[in-house]
């Protein structure tokens, strides 16, 4: 009731107002008056009925509406503005408040609804420019209400009409407010149309998700998204509870649930696709919604008010409702409004009319399009969008464009509206197949025309639209985007004639593109990594690089300011690209610092991050909507960086191959085949020529026309791959010649035409026109000729048609072709020549060949021509790809950045370098530095060393710190470069690697510059003589340390104050607190570098420090101080990292500590001391070696630096460490002892004394308390003491050192458990052996070293201590320890270690070896049980060695020791040991027999045959001169080696004599040794004396005879052992007998210089060997225990005695016979003592010899014994029988 009254009130008032108007009272308005009156009457009647309450249920609303609408329609058709305004106002209100819904069918037009008629009526009120301005405003309001009202629905043609009307009002209205309002209304309408479409899908999706049983929700009112008014509307509607009727009757008679939101479409059809309802929103309720009314009213008022305001402020489009990501930032928003007063010049674009009318046109293909939409709202949006696209394509008029012209304004506003639609596009629009297709087919083609417009506004809008497409639609527009870049943007940048304005706008656009990380990476992935696409990214960067470098600005007709602006923008783009790469790969970056990141400092990461986030969100939203909206969108291929990299490599190979082909085709083909990119078959090559468009068409033609067999085959295959089926001949020829340019040579053309003709006939075998292929061949040739004739400018007289027909007579198998046919060919060629393929590079001549443009006018003309060409190409390409689908990859992987950067780092570096070098503009410098920082970051992250080093070197170069030019040239940009370098070091330290070198070098030079700049004398060191502190003036400085800074001229003499002031000013900023702190932060921040980075950092810091210190006159220690600092900072790192750091720093300290400049070395050592103290404080766990590594530099310095000052300082440092940190030292003891080891051999008494004091303190005191910690270094301690002992200059120290070594033995003895429990990581020793390996072995080994190295007194002391230790602690030694020990002991006898000088060697053998030999035997005897099994053979071998030496004393000692050893231990010998012992003696005997005596002849001496008598005399003299006592003492029997007669003899003779002499001595000693071993303590001398006494007394009484049965080793030896000894004795005897008998040889020796008082002889050896032999045999002969051997003994005895007696008879010399006297006494005496039975055998053998002996003049004693012997023979053989026993001599009575 209330609603009806309200509506009636509206209508009544409006009708009354119309009637009251005086215009209506005119006659022509009678129908209007009548209609108004009828309507008023009806309303009154209706109200009366309602008042009486008798009213029936109201009729359907549309019947009433029909009645009420007629007067308004008539009013709108009137010519009176006031009447029309009133009518429009009422209609607007009725629609706004929902009183008119217009769903009723239009009675006047079948198939339409009333609302369509209402809207049409409103639209028709606009009659062009002359329409009243008030009416125009009312029309706008009414139409906006119609479109936005939630109560009515208008679609398709009607909605197009509303938009068209507003559009026309905007164009035609002269009122600025109306124009602006119309434009704002258009924007609002479009917003509503597209938002409704989006919301419908969302609503539909929500309803599908609802469970079937859920109760229906309140309908959703469609409204503009994001508008506060509409959000209020939604709230109010949500709060209200409208009543929903059960059913609503539709005009086609169907009934449907209003909740499902059915609406009727044009012609009553409601297409449904995919089962979705037609409408996603419910039919609005019939009830009046006061909230809705209020909102709609607000909207209308808002639109008008804001429009007026905007017009006044000359503002354009309202801000879009959604955030647009990185590409639509505020800075780059294109002002959509068109300045009415702006003047533009330029030639109109290519004119290609699409439609004659400047109106939007309804959809021609209505149903076909509709059938592909899921809802009518989508169709509405599509129609509006397509219309706007077509409007934007309309050409402008001829001549310069007029900003106020309808055409231009139409174009601009259409583009603005399109931009608005695209910027606010929702998921449906962005993904639905139809919209994507529309964008491809309409919008992109439109943009290809407008994108090269000479009108800046149009161009700018086109760029803005392209940006939006790139941001929101790139997934679908891969190929279109490529065309935009390739044909428009980059062409404009590359063309030298393009205007600054166009370049500026393009580069502004690129700035936005380059700021979107996703976009930048996507461009690279989708184009540069696509085999079929252009290298957009690479080309873009190269172009931007050229712009940034500011090349050829004068050629481009730009002012310097414009060029600079362009350069800045170019640089900004390049920097943005790198920022994007940094942003893209930021997850890989590890910032060593927490204070700041590169991103926060350098780039607007927030924007970039948000942009990327939005972009990702957009991609996600598109994906989510695609499943419900569209089935035709492109699915992205998988993002695999490795795959793309492979493709990129292939592409580069192909491009290189094409480049080669375009120079020399065969080379290109060969290269591609070698790389596997092209098959070997001719078909493959032919296909390649067809498909690859980048090939030079001329080269292709030349290649195909070549006469070689291979080329022919390719040409045949090429032609065979063409299909000419059912093609006209000329058309086929055109197709054929499209692929290449015909070569100039006739023969080549001939071959090509021949094959073409054959192929054409082959494809068209059914044709009857040509008799054979010959006809086709001739005709083809003639067509080529005709083309040349008709279209060549050189040909003046063109061929006529008749001439052409005549020329072709008789070519068809001697017949003619039809004249009509030839005529048509002529006409066709005349109209359009056969255009052969042009090479692409030549399409724009000025691009490749830079022309010098004479004037601005000429440049503009050229540019317009080029733009026209560009537009044609772009449009053609755009149309060609409008239906193509190419998969677009949305990049997600971080790894794309690496190949991207690798591709473009060089042009980037060129741009930044030239920018820094040539331009002093701070903004340019700032951009360049920012770019370099980003580039360094990327190169760092991806480990690209070459690239990283190049950029860091560029920074270093532009800091001027390493430049050779004068530093006074330093500018702000150089200061900023230094700051950038410092920042890079701070933020990218983890990745800098070798680039640290440049950075640290600059920091070093910076410090020098700061010091000089501030007038402070830099810390130079000039050795001991320091120069006076003060100014630099007059300072003579070496050139090299200033070479980098260019300070040579500044600091050398003669610098004036002005120059210095200038310099100080230029470097002043580098001394600012911020720079100083930043530099310091690099070093303090080194703690946050990772393990590898800190090593690189330290390594290069050390290298720079070495450079600083390299100056011989003025070394600097800045970096050295920093090394000390960072050592402090980083000491708390994990030990693994620290050890790697110290490996580098320690090595540096090694070098610095040995610096020839003492001040440097002192600083190094002192720094080392401080660091070491701090490090030692930390302590060390067992088995670690960090201290050892840390302290090693002390060791190195001590070893290499010979400066007493430094050496003394090192010792003092170490002593200080020992005194203060002894408790914390572990592995460091090794270094400490190593340092003292070096000091121990010094010649400086102070150094030795100080070192020894500390060493003594350690060994005697510290070891007491910290022995377990020092075990690992125990060996080093002993070695160190050994070195002190070996310093001959300080004997007292030596003796004390040996005492301390003895003291160390006490530690080992007292603490064996500590040694056993100690485990070391480098010693794989059994626990039982640790005491030996760690304790005893080092002590004994070092003592052996002392013995081997020192002088007599020290080595004797060492020897004594060594054997004392053995004797004292040997009981604790294991058997295998003794083996090691004796190896050490035997080193004393090692020939290699003996002194080389003969005298020293002799002394050594006589003293030390002698001493050692006896000591060995003592030890062996003491520990025989433990040693004999393992060491007896070694001892025997050593004794043998001694015996063989050329030292008489040592040889004697060897035999004596052997004797002592056997006598001392023989009782314990086993048979095996006796065996070994006897073998040893046998070996010694054999090796010491001087066989050379019998054969030797002096070199060059002739043999002299001597007179026999002379020999005899000499011999007699020789033998008589023997001093028996001397020979008994072991003196030479040959001659005296000290005799003067030796001096004349050569050294070799002397050596030989000495050797022979010693061998003889050894033989004699051995005989004595055997004698002593067998019979000790009885001696042969004693026995001989007894025999002599007995003979003298003429008795052999038993009383005088001494029993020796139980003495000596005889009883422990077997007969076999004794036989071995007997063999030795017999051999010795035989040799000496042979020598003594060889008078001639003895004479030779004597004459060769071996002459003394007599000739040499071996008489003593001869007699003593036989005597010993006889004693043993006779002892065995009477031994009952050896009865089983008596036979052998007897045989031996008989043989020996017989030979002896026989020899004696032959001796001529009386003295010789005298020497044998004792032998004969022994022989006869012993024989007399045997039993008669045995005596018989002997007597019978000896008898004849004894008889012979009788004739010699014998001594009485011998005669007495002989007498007894003969008597005994008489008795035994019973020759005589004594009458009584008293007659038998006493000596024989025992045998009697």
UniProtKB/Swiss-Prot annotation:
It comes from the Eukaryota. One of its GO terms (molecular function) is protein kinase A regulatory subunit binding. Its main location: cytoplasm. The keyword Cytoplasm applies. Residues 207-294 are annotated as: Disordered. InterPro entries: ARM-type_fold, DCB_dom, Mon2/Sec7/BIG1-like_HDS, Mon2/Sec7/BIG1-like_HUS, Sec7/BIG1-like_C, Sec7_C_sf, Sec7_dom, Sec7_dom_sf. It holds the Pfam family BIG2_C. Keywords: Acetylation, Cell projection, Cytoplasm, Cytoplasmic vesicle, Cytoskeleton, Endosome, Golgi apparatus, Guanine-nucleotide releasing factor, Membrane, Phosphoprotein, Protein transport, Synapse, Transport. It is found in: Cytoplasm; Membrane; Golgi apparatus; Cytoplasm, Perinuclear region. The modification N-acetylmethionine is found at residue 1. PROSITE patterns: SEC7. Residues 214-225, 233-243 have a biased composition (Polar residues). SUPFAM superfamilies: ARM repeat, Sec7 domain. Residues 661-792 form the SEC7 domain. Inhibited by brefeldin A. The modification Phosphoserine is found at residues 214, 218, 227, 355-356, 621, 624, 707, 1518, 1520-1521, 1532, 1535, 1541, 1789. In vitro phosphorylated by PKA reducing its GEF activity and dephosphorylated by phosphatase PP1. CDD domains: Sec7. Residues 515-535 are annotated as: HUS. Homodimer. Interacts with ARFGEF1/BIG1; both proteins are probably part of the same or very similar macromolecular complexes. Interacts with PRKAR1A, PRKAR2A, PRKAR1B, PRKAR2B, PPP1CC, PDE3A, TNFRSF1A, MYCBP and EXOC7. Interacts with GABRB1, GABRB2 and GABRB3. PANTHER family: BREFELDIN A-INHIBITED GUANINE NUCLEOTIDE-EXCHANGE PROTEIN 2 (PTHR10663:SF124), GUANYL-NUCLEOTIDE EXCHANGE FACTOR (PTHR10663). This is Brefeldin A-inhibited guanine nucleotide-exchange protein 2. It comes from Mus musculus (Mouse).
